[in-house]
Design a protein with these regions (language model features):
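Metal-coordinating catalytic core of metallo-dependent amide/deamination hydrolases
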Residues: 142-277
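Alpha-helical scaffold segments that flank or form the walls of functional sites
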Residues: 85-156, 180-194, 201
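C-terminal cap of metal-dependent C-N hydrolases
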Residues: 14, 390-442
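N-terminal metal-binding scaffold of metallo-dependent hydrolase/deaminase domains
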Residues: 1-48
């Protein structure tokens, strides 16, 4: 059954401009994929050439004066740090990890605690319109399985990583290479099967997740690379976030020419789809290696500011044709709202512009494209309303933002800067409306 939605439609096919369709229509097929977008039903019907059912015969859901936009994608977030949002913001990366982050993550050996926190985490992603996320869990297989089940239960998309760590970490937050591999094998067996109805990848899948090189021995990194290659799994980790971290990596991996090369030697830098968070100090050979291997940069502006890591030069990555997405990176970051990340990304780019006028700051369309189509590419054909893209969407009712006399694009801009979850009325992931996930009330 094809469904058609009517609203003011805004999305970005390309980074330089918005597609804006006033009172437009978008057709979605039974598999949750976009068939076409048009200004009227006759034009829409002409686009729907692959279906036996004419658009005139399909159900039309009219959202009236509301905005219809692609849903948000978060390409770097730590679920077990949910409770730590907004604390320890006066520390830099390495002491922040040792004194706050690692002690909190150790609690996730307790699945009852994990369920309580993870339900709240998934609920808040939903609240802010994030329908896909690339997520760090912990070393604990059972609580990682629980998190993946919660995403499945919610009907939201996620790449979830059981974190690999075996050095420079507290007792209780490390495991052997064998234990790591066994845990991954179990999760891969459970969550890597395609949808039986569509043969498309499952909405919730594992992602190989060495935390970062300082917490992983060469043996652990090698095993992670083998898992990624054997099962063709994506990879996520951290890269060049902090100067002290970079210096430590140089000592731990002296044969590597740069931080990125250390990952590359173990098959963890683009040999399968890879996203690396931060990249604040990436340059030269590392930048070229990212470009050559199509490694995505997860730009985490709030975390980079909060932990005094630096200002990531996003324009440099865009000009190098390196894919870029946005990450909330809680709890280095303090906010799960990707719309806020757009604003911070624009503001950080303006600060970079003041240091180097050769790198112009981000436009609104570029920031929106990064958060939707560019970030969405890590999950498949996600983040746009072009034909063949999975229908991940948000319906925005901005009437309480006093939108009279503004253009549709100005209304979207005002929502991004002034709005919050209260204006998001409907959320869709892969064509299905996503209702509010349950949270534990204890």
């Amino acid at each position: 059954m094809k469904r058609i939605y009517k609203a003011h439609i805004l999305y970005t096919k390309e980074q330089s401009r918005f597609e804006v369709i006033e009172n437009g229509y978008v057709a979605v097929d039974a598999n949750g994929c976009v068939l076409g977008v048009a200004t009227d039903l006759a034009s829409l019907n002409a686009q729907c050439t692959t279906s036996d059912v004419h658009c005139q015969e399909s159900e039309v859901i009219d959202f009236g004066d509301r905005l219809l936009i692609p849903a948000m994608n978060d390409v770097h977030v730590h679920a077990p740090q949910y409770r730590n949002q907004g604390i320890a913001m006066d520390l830099e990366l390495l002491p922040w990890l040792q004194n706050y982050t690692f002690p909190e993550e150790m609690k996730y050996a307790d699945t009852a605690y994990a369920e309580r926190m993870y339900r709240r985490f998934v609920h808040d992603l939903w609240r802010f319109g994030t329908m896909r996320a690339c997520v760090f869990a912990t070393i604990h297989t059972e609580s990682t399985r629980l998190l993946m089940n919660l995403f499945q239960e919610a009907g939201m998309g996620a790449l979830v990583g059981k974190v690999a760590m075996d050095r420079n970490s507290p007792e209780g937050l490390t495991e052997s290479v064998e234990e790591m591999a066994q845990g991954y094998e179990a999760l891969i067996e459970e969550f890597s099967h395609p949808s039986p109805l569509t043969s498309r990848p499952s909405l919730v899948r594992p992602v190989v997740t060495p935390r970062f090189i300082p917490t992983c021995t060469p043996e652990m990194l090698h095993a992670c690379g083998q898992l990624a290659a054997k099962y063709q799994l994506p990879v996520q980790s951290h890269l060049s976030e902090n100067k002290d971290e970079i210096a430590l990596v140089a000592k731990l991996e002296p044969d590597s020419t740069c931080y990125g090369d250390a990952y590359h030697r173990y098959g963890l830098f683009g040999q399968t789809p890879t996203v690396m968070a931060h990249c604040v100090w990436t340059e030269g050979e590392e930048l070229e290696l990212m470009k050559r291997n199509s490694v995505m940069m997860a730009h985490c502006p709030t975390s980079n500011l909060n932990l005094a890591s630096g200002l990531a030069p996003v324009r440099m990555f865009l000009e190098a044709d390196i894919p870029v997405g946005l990450g909330s990176d809680i709890s280095g970051g303090h906010d799960l709202n990707i719309f806020r990340m757009m604003v911070y990304a624009i503001q950080v780019s303006k600060m970079c512009y003041q240091r180097n006028h050769d790198h112009r700051f981000l436009s609104l369309s570029e920031a929106f494209w990064i958060a939707t189509k560019s970030a969405g590419s890590f999950f498949g054909r996600v983040g746009s309303f072009e034909p063949g893209y999975e229908f991940d969407a948000l319906v925005i009712n901005d009437s309480d933002l006093n939108h009279d006399h503004y253009s549709l694009l100005e209304r979207l801009e005002r929502f991004i800067y002034l709005g919050d979850d209260r204006q998001i009325e409907h959320r869709f992931c892969r064509g299905e409306e996503v209702g509010e996930p349950q949270t534990l009330r204890t």
